[in-house]
Curated annotation (Swiss-Prot):
Function: Catalytic subunit of the periplasmic nitrate reductase complex NapAB. Receives electrons from NapB and catalyzes the reduction of nitrate to nitrite.
Signal peptide annotation: 1-29
InterPro entries attached to this UniProt entry: Asp_de-COase-like_dom_sf (IPR009010), CT_Nitrate-R-NapA-like (IPR041957), MoPterin_dinucl-bd_dom (IPR006657), Mopterin_OxRdtase (IPR006656), Mopterin_OxRdtase_4Fe-4S_dom (IPR006963), MopterinOxRdtase_cofactor_BS (IPR027467), Periplasm_NO3_reductase_lsu (IPR010051), Prok_molybdopt-oxidoreductase (IPR050123)
Protein name (database record): Periplasmic nitrate reductase
Positions with a binding annotation for Mo-bis(molybdopterin guanine dinucleotide): 85, 152, 177, 181, 214-221, 245-249, 264-266, 374, 378, 484, 510-511, 533, 560, 720-729, 804, 821
Primary site of residence: periplasm
GO MF, one example: iron ion binding
Organism expressing this protein natively: Psychromonas ingrahamii (strain DSM 17664 / CCUG 51855 / 37)
Family as reported in the entry's similarity comment: Belongs to the prokaryotic molybdopterin-containing oxidoreductase family. NasA/NapA/NarB subfamily.
Catalytic activity line of the entry: 2 Fe(II)-[cytochrome] + nitrate + 2 H(+) = 2 Fe(III)-[cytochrome] + nitrite + H2O
EC number: 1.9.6.1
Gene Ontology cellular-component terms listed: membrane; nitrate reductase complex; periplasmic space
A Pfam family that the UniProt record links to this protein: Molybdopterin
Length: 831
């Protein structure tokens, strides 16, 4: 057997990566050492299907199946390394219960909301689905139809969905599951900088002197980035790591300064740091004078609950993001009350640890990167937390340069690309445009070749509101794609399941597997997965990555893109648009939504001659044109020249991703900084060009308590989250035998003293209950997650233990993002 040098290097890289990750390469994921000529395995690149890190993998296919995956040595993100989930990617598409035909609830051959699922053809599925959507539109108008999408959609799936809903059905009732994970990050960016997404990149990991983790367990949730951080820390004795969390987890193993704080008190800690910087004359005065403004935000803004909820009714300024200008001196006075004594009182963190943390931010010689994920974003004041984090970096000028900056890490593979950049939120359009702005609507209508007034100006129902409107019978035809919200959404007993089973509603769920959500629906559509279709994701560092279709989906399964576009053929313009709108563009009369949205001379501009004969591309060949390229190029036209520039389509198939803005073929590593960002004018040093005056905003915002806290009856905090072995609801990872065996069932992590006080011990069955529901689980008092007294942690991957029966559907009133990290529970021993 002969090896080329390239093949040998790949084998070495794979072996080294596995050793670092602490696992042996499984046989199904370790084919490099076999000659490709003998095994006939074909290798191609694709971004990983799981988290927002955006690792690149090499996918090995043979006889029409994915048989192996390995880390891509040419990837600048993961450099050949994969986490344990990535090593088993080859198995996620081959679960025994993979769906291959549409399933409709029926009794005696007729649709019945209370019937059993029975197979139907795609035509029959689309027939009844179209009837239900048309009926809802006719009876109640566009607000009666909606869609819940995903940060796991490809770019063109999200873009096609946005056009179908916002331009076709003329409803803004489209929201992604990224509402649950990244909406507060979006709100924070837009308030402070006027433009979304991080200014830094992963290169900061090799440049920083100090890493601070806020509500982020990178060791398990972003393990490849953690490996790069660990390498930097362990090879440089002067580098330090600070970790803040409400419980101890694996990231604390590397922490030089670990801090456990009382839930919600991160707001007080951040204001303390700002005060410390000012009191110790560590403010970069030249920077803030040139590049920032100061504003004071309104307070007492509520908790995103139903308007009838007593907490919401009591709010003085419910849902308000208003603010007013103040001076630096007024800001300094505002944060002066947040001294170390106050921060200690609120957080429970010892003073010396807080001061040690504040000193690294204040030290002008230290380059600091702050990372956060769901601990900040899933927070009833998540936007504020993001704003306060930016305050610290702006006050010190530690921003938008190598090794210094705030960095919001992303949870899903394309929450940045598809949810945020494409604009699949209920209030957004591509490239940071919003539906409420008439100029923005006009831009979209022009690019989409639509008559003026097509796009509705009022934001649609966001994720949590969609559930409430389903329950209240105001949203009646509903399509769920690429997510598992009945398992993932908060307060499912009271606010989600009733809406799905409401007899007035028709629920469609597109999924590869019979998830909890699929089983609650009325029609299930079998979906193609990952490399069974051509796709593109955008990761947390603004890196856009493409992949080709590499295998065919099981017969009968169709991609989300195919479903969206094919479904559009069922609607004549007269069935969805008003007569006055059609009168503005009479030539569309008699045409279908497919004709107007996807065969508009732009989306269908690239022919099948651009798809190589040897390439699989089921959607392009079904529709007769290179639809992915057409959708991408039309979408990219929104951002080019406006700070969101994307490279030409074909370039991404060659590259290992490019970080936007991409101008003149060059990607941007650090935004807003002269010399790195092409949009920053020469001689200006820094320009936060999202705002008209090109300045960022430093906000004066207070500490405010959570929506629910422990009391005498419900005496414990509950925090939910993930574990290394499983991703989100586990609908893919729990079908991989090796990952399932590694962590088969969810458990409730709790402090041993709390367990003893309740008469339970490790392994005992317990009942975990809140005011909203209860479940049975088992106690874990050891292991990777070690809560302090008074708090328990439970992961949500286990469909047998739906922890979101217990959680509260309170949200950040500005971002509408759910707070999964704080509610009150009690634990009793199961008898």
């Amino acid at each position: 057997m002969k090896f080329t040098r390239r093949e040998f290097m790949k084998a070495q890289a794979a072996a080294s990566a596995a050793a670092v990750a602490g696992i042996a390469l499984p046989a199904t994921a370790s084919n490099l050492i076999a000659s490709q000529d003998l095994t006939k395995i074909k290798w191609e690149k694709a971004p990983c299907r799981f988290c927002g890190t955006g690792c690149s993998v090499l996918v090995g296919t043979q006889h029409g199946r994915v048989v192996a995956t390995q880390g891509d040595p040419e990837s600048p993100v993961n450099k050949g390394l994969n986490c344990v989930k990535g090593y088993f990617l080859s198995k996620i598409m081959y679960g025994k219960d993979r769906l291959t035909t549409p399933l409709l609830r029926m009794t005696e051959g007729v649709y019945d909301k209370n019937g059993q699922f029975e197979p139907v053809s795609w035509d029959a599925a689309f027939d009844i689905m179209a009837d239900k959507f048309k009926d809802a539109l006719k009876k109640k108008g566009p607000t009666a139809v909606g869609m819940f999408g995903s940060g796991q959609w490809t770019l063109w799936e999200g873009y096609a969905a946005s056009k179908l809903m916002k331009a076709g059905f003329r409803t803004n009732n489209l929201d992604p599951n990224a509402r649950h994970c990244m909406a507060s990050a979006v709100g924070g960016f837009m308030r402070t900088f006027g433009i979304d997404e991080p200014m830094g990149c992963y290169d900061d990991l090799e440049n920083a002197d100090v890493f601070v983790l806020w509500g982020s367990n990178m060791a398990e949730m972003h393990p490849i980035l953690w490996s790069r951080l660990a390498d930097r820390r362990l090879s440089n004795p002067d580098v330090s790591v600070h970790v803040l969390s409400t419980y101890t987890h694996r990231s604390f193993e590397l922490a030089d300064n670990g801090m456990i704080f009382t839930p919600q008190s991160d707001l007080a800690i951040l204001n303390f740091i700002a005060n410390y910087i000012i009191q110790n004359d560590a403010v970069d005065k030249d920077f803030i004078e040139k590049h920032t403004n100061f504003r004071k935000g309104v307070t007492d803004i509520g908790y995103g609950l139903r308007p009838t909820d007593p907490l919401q009714k009591a709010a003085e300024n419910p849902d308000s993001g208003a603010s007013s200008p103040i001076t630096f001196e007024e800001f300094a006075e505002y944060v002066s009350e947040f001294d170390v004594d106050y921060a200690v009182k609120m957080s429970g963190v010892p003073a010396e640890k807080l001061i040690e943390l504040a000193k690294v931010y204040a030290d002008p010689a230290k380059k600091v990167v702050s990372y956060w994920t769901m601990g900040f974003n899933q927070h009833t004041r998540g936007v504020w937390a993001n704003n306060l984090m930016y305050n610290v970096h702006l006050l010190t000028g530690k921003i938008s340069k190598p090794g210094s900056g705030p960095f919001s890490l992303t949870g899903q593979p394309s929450a940045c690309g598809t949810a945020r950049e494409v604009g699949t939120f209920s209030h957004r359009l591509p490239a940071d445009l919003v539906v409420a702005n008439p100029k923005h609507r006009a831009i979209a209508e022009k690019l989409w070749k639509l008559p003026e007034g097509t796009i509705e100006p009022k934001p649609g129902y966001h994720a949590v509101l969609q559930n409430r409107m389903l329950k209240d019978s105001k949203l009646n035809a509903y399509w769920v794609m690429c997510n598992n919200n009945v398992q993932a959404g908060a307060n499912i007993n009271e606010e989600i399941i009733p809406g799905y089973r409401n007899p007035e509603n028709f629920i469609v769920v597109s999924d590869p597997y019979p998830t909890v959500t699929a089983q609650m629906g009325d029609l299930i559509l079998p979906t193609a997965m990952w490399v069974e279709k051509e796709g593109a994701y955008g990761n947390a560092e603004r890196r856009t990555q493409f992949w080709h279709q590499q295998v065919k989906a099981p017969e009968g399964a169709k991609s989300d893109l195919w479903q969206l576009v094919e479904f559009s053929k069922r609607f004549k313009i007269e069935e969805v648009w008003t007569e006055d709108l059609i009168a503005k563009m009479p030539e569309v009369r008699g045409e279908t939504l497919f004709d107007v949205l996807y065969k508009n001379g732009q989306v269908d501009a690239f022919g099948l001659d651009e798809v190589a004969d040897e390439r699989l591309n089921d959607e392009a060949r079904d529709f007769g044109f290179y639809i992915q390229k057409g959708l991408f190029e039309e979408y990219a036209s929104f951002g080019r020249g406006h700070g969101h520039d994307l490279a030409p389509f074909d370039q991404y198939h060659e590259a290992r991703g490019l970080r936007w803005p991409v101008v003149n073929g060059k990607e941007t590593l650090w935004r807003f900084r002269e010399g790195y960002d092409p949009y920053v004018e020469k001689g200006s040093e820094v320009q936060f060009y999202g705002h008209p005056d090109k300045k960022a905003v430093i906000f004066a915002l207070p500490y405010e308590p959570p929506a629910e806290s422990p009391d005498q009856e419900y005496d414990l905090w509950l925090s939910t989250g993930r574990v290394l072995e499983h991703w989100h609801s586990g609908s893919m990872t729990r079908r991989v035998p090796e990952l399932y065996k590694a962590f088969p069932d969810a458990v409730v992590f709790m402090h041993p003293d709390d367990a003893t006080a309740r008469g339970v011990r490790r392994g005992d069955e317990i009942v975990l209950a809140s005011r909203r529901g209860e479940l049975t689980s088992r106690v874990e008092t050891r292991g990777r997650n070690r809560p302090p007294r008074g708090l328990v942690f439970m992961p949500w991957f286990d469909a047998k233990q739906l922890v979101n029966k217990i959680t509260l559907d309170a949200t950040d009133p500005l971002s509408k993002q759910t707070d999964y990290k704080k509610c009150a529970v009690k634990i009793t021993k199961k008898v």
